[in-house]
């Protein structure tokens, strides 16, 4: 392969790959920070599965989904609208996974109402999601401008 073709291929995959790696790292950190207190509890869906297995699979699914969505959102010209949409989508996805972990590892073994599940998930997730979503979105936008 000649150098120009290698350079074109690398420049084509550099942005999506960077977005995917950052989303993977920040999502894994968020799941462990928010729901790490449930890592010693048994999963109701898979008695042999570790917390890491669940977190890793959720992170992989999130990385693929969010990478596609964030690449699509990168075509939006209004940076304010783009950042707001990225934050809302990221917060929604992370809260959803945190809720799934809470239900799987805590409330499935007890008698929580839906409202209580949401409130406890919010309690555990608020600080990690608030901090990491802002850091993630601004880091991604900063790096995307540089690429």
Enumerate the language-model features and the residues they cover.
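Alpha-helical membrane-associated segments of multi-pass integral membrane proteins
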Residues: 12-19, 108-147
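N-terminal signal-anchor transmembrane alpha-helix
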Residues: 2-54, 59-61
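Alpha-helical transmembrane segments in multipass membrane proteins, preferentially the mid-helix core
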Residues: 61-76, 136-141
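Membrane-embedded alpha-helical segments of multi-pass membrane proteins
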Residues: 60-65, 127-131
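Membrane-interfacial segments
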Residues: 33-38, 42, 76-81, 104-105, ...
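Loop-to-transmembrane helix junctions at the membrane interface
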Residues: 67-97
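Aromatic-anchored segments of alpha-helical transmembrane domains
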Residues: 22-32, 88-101
């Amino acid at each position: 392969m000649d150098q120009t073709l290698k350079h074109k291929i690398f420049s084509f995959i550099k942005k999506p790959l960077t977005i995917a790696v950052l989303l993977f790292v920040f999502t894994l950190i968020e799941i462990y920070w928010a729901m790490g207190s449930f890592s010693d509890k048994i999963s109701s869906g898979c008695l042999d599965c570790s917390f890491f297995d669940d977190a890793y699979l959720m992170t992989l699914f999130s990385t693929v989904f969010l990478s596609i969505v964030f690449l699509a959102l990168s075509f939006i010209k209004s940076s304010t609208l783009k950042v707001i949409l990225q934050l809302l989508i990221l917060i929604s996805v992370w809260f959803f996974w945190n809720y799934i972990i809470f239900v799987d590892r805590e409330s499935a073994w007890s008698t929580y109402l839906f409202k209580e599940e949401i409130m406890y998930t919010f309690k555990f997730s608020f600080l990690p999601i608030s901090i990491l979503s802002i850091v993630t979105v601004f880091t991604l936008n900063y790096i995307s401008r540089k690429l």
